[in-house]
């Protein structure tokens, strides 16, 4: 897992470390990006974070559970005040997203200062219309 984080951190620094950079991360890719951010200064570019995985999630109705590697690291870093969030980030998560856990993502955003938009009645796969609008906005900034 650490080798993937290191690869993301290296690629960000090597190829995308400027204010005009635009990065889009989704789900587990967001998880890797956020872990890479722990090793870096605040990312200077624009980041669109679509339903991020930030740690453990449970779905009580189906008894499903998702437990990624280093599941407590991001929340602990945020709580300890050592997570340096990207300078220009926006996070979007569906209100019915059990994989990301919208309540946890909102809490993480509040602790770190990253703005989080909860998309009503959507799950982990945000609608094409919603994501399309976000991409248009993100890529034309």
Predicted features, each with a name:
Residues 98-104, 127:
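Conserved alpha/beta-hydrolase "acid-adjacent" motif
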């Amino acid at each position: 897992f650490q080798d993937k984080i290191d690869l993301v951190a290296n690629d960000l620094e090597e190829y995308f470390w400027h204010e005009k950079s635009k990065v889009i991360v989704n789900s587990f890719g967001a998880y890797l990006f956020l872990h890479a951010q722990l090793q870096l200064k605040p990312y200077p570019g624009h980041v669109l974070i679509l339903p991020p995985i930030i740690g453990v999630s449970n779905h009580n109705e189906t008894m499903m559970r998702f437990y990624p590697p280093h599941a407590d690291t991001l929340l602990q870093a945020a709580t300890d005040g050592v997570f340096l969030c990207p300078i220009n980030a926006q996070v979007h998560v569906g209100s019915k997203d059990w994989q990301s856990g919208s309540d946890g993502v909102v809490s993480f955003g509040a602790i770190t200062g990253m703005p989080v938009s909860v998309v009503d009645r959507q799950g982990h796969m945000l609608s094409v219309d919603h994501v399309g609008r976000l991409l248009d906005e993100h890529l034309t900034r």
